[in-house]
Amino acid sequence: MKKISLPKIGIRPVIDGRRMGVRESLEEQTMNMAKATAALLTEKLRHACGAAVECVISDTCIAGMAEAAACEEKFSSQNVGLTITVTPCWCYGSETIDMDPTRPKAIWGFNGTERPGAVYLAAALAAHSQKGIPAFSIYGHDVQDADDTSIPADVEEKLLRFARAGLAVASMKGKSYLSLGGVSMGIAGSIVDHNFFESWLGMKVQAVDMTELRRRIDQKIYDEAELEMALAWADKNFRYGEDENNKQYQRNAEQSRAVLRESLLMAMCIRDMMQGNSKLTDIGRVEESLGYNAIAAGFQGQRHWTDQYPNGDTAEAILNSSFDWNGVREPFVVATENDSLNGVAMLMGHQLTGTAQVFADVRTYWSPEAIERVTGHKLDGLAEHGIIHLINSGSAALDGSCKQRDSEGNPTMKPHWEISQQEADACLAATEWCPAIHEYFRGGGYSSRFLTEGGVPFTMTRVNIIKGLGPVLQIAEGWSVELPKDVHDILNKRTNSTWPTTWFAPRLTGKGPFTDVYSVMANWGANHGVLTIGHVGADFITLASMLRIPVCMHNVEETKVYRPSAWAAHGMDIEGQDYRACQNYGPLYKR
């Protein structure tokens, strides 16, 4: 099959159409703004898959309806998924704007005195607001000279934030969520809401029973040579932790090998179901070779699978990581327990950053007093106000050990295109694989166990659906925390010490849900959350506004909150504006 092309960014230079001197004097400056914008975006951004971002510039400057239509025809033929309109001057507002109702759009009006770029910006945004097609405003803080071709830092920040979020919107559109199984243990996020995916994300849901995974394994609908490669890789790289099961439930070497083999097969088959695998045509499995065009997936597992077959922990952890037996590659998005709403938060984080995402239970709030009582240790530094224990048996990406390093040598999680094989090996070396606890997983399996290094900035997110309101997004920026080993051991052994742990300290504001760490835990909307590397809450906020998903909780500085200009007309409190605007405009792909 022909590979689906990646979305491009359309650049629309608009101009004052009056000939006999006005337009002619502005052509070069206007087109240079478009070229400078395209150069910035192609230099600074990549798609989540690692491919270079492409920009498509209108063949001519746009002065009115005819040239706007010609530009639209070009964009439609080149898979443009978002647009940025640029101008240094007055132009004719509603005649020149991008009217596509679902394509994210921004307008950069040059802040100069010679020509009124700001006046066009205001006029065009007024037209967008009146027509119900929200657009983002970009206007530099400081006046520039007419011949200044540089892009100021504040303008650059908005251009990049808009483009990152817009590319995420465009990349999700038309893809599918693979729901492998049904509802896991009554977890609401695994009650997959087709309307949410269709109306807010522009995605389909592909529902497949877990017997399809069983069929593929039993009927050998996979690449047998790759399975041998995967087993050899695991033999070389896997370190095994203690078996905490009672003697009667411990497996011998032959049984353990069978569990490992099936766990790796699950990873291969889930991957093939998501994206397809042309090698399956070689064994006569053309239909299965196509996959389901899934950009994200979830695996129910518990309990209808895990009561008799190996659990999904190994498969999910490997798929969500940035590497496997084939080397470093783009991480997949696979949600434990088919928690589709946590899967969407993972998908957002991956699309915005290109990095692996850490899926976790938001398990326990530990107050400073409670930790001192049970360990004798007094918390300090980032942890002084208490910490949240993030831990789950399943799909935490191994990148979450933070054994990768940034340019200054600090622990981090990198976009996959920046990860070296040595860093991938370091993450594997920091991970132990512990036999699954029989009481939870009667069919066996292996859980990854690692401890996230401390002092790393993270953003924790979660999507929830509220009846009568729709989807909402929660955001909590903070840091991982490193505890003394003896303190970690005491706390970890009070829960399940065979699972991966991140000790998380959210940044507090002293207000609302961020009054203290307890309040963050108390206001979290579900049992799961996602960690994305960096303090990227502002990007999540911009993305959510494009999709019309209100943010019900965040600790991002107000100066970094960037939403469409029409939000300002929905009241004076910016979070109330968000709710009213999202309700007014409705989901991006209204159904």
From Swiss-Prot:
Pathway: Carbohydrate degradation; L-fucose degradation; L-lactaldehyde and glycerone phosphate from L-fucose: step 1/3. GO terms for biological process: D-arabinose catabolic process; L-fucose catabolic process. It catalyses: L-fucose = L-fuculose. Its cofactor is Mn(2+). Its EC number is 5.3.1.25. GO terms for molecular function: arabinose isomerase activity; L-fucose isomerase activity; manganese ion binding. The active site is at 337 (proton acceptor), 361 (proton acceptor). Mn(2+) binds at residues 337, 361, 528. Keywords: Carbohydrate metabolism, Cytoplasm, Fucose metabolism, Isomerase, Manganese, Metal-binding. Its main location: cytoplasm. One of its GO terms (cellular component) is cytoplasm. Belongs to the L-fucose isomerase family. PANTHER family: L-FUCOSE ISOMERASE. Homohexamer. This is L-fucose isomerase. It comes from Escherichia coli O17:K52:H18 (strain UMN026 / ExPEC). The gene is fucI.
